């Protein structure tokens, strides 16, 4: 089993009025040259959690951090106009919370962060600020919900 020390939360960057099945997600990732879905888990709007990549297989979800991380993606992340927004349904919120806590029981040394929290600290102040984000993903403050961060 590989060493896991990071859980990274993502959004699929799909509009709130659209759906993206696990099969659609897999197809999108294959078109980008990956050998399947890069995330380990995918959470649908109804809260269903799909295992999309075995945990023992290195993910393809955040360059430079894949070897020792688990990627979780929720369906959504954009409002109906295509702007970044926390579009999680109550069912997604609950499923994400349960999944992260289950993974923290299995990997207690893990830190939990959002994809954007792994952006480079361009001004060197020790904090990743909105103007430094490479992308807005997952469109909510992961550290506020899970109390840990990548720093």
Show which residues each predicted segment covers.
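Short, conserved "active-site rim" segments that organize catalytic pockets and cofactor/ligand binding
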Residues: 1-57, 66
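Basic/polar, cationic surfaces and motifs that engage anionic cell-wall
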Residues: 1-8, 12, 45-49, 66-68, ...
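Short amphipathic alpha-helices and their capping/turn segments at secondary-structure boundaries
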Residues: 56-63, 101
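Ligand-binding face of N-terminal immunoglobulin V-set domains in extracellular IgSF glycoproteins
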Residues: 72
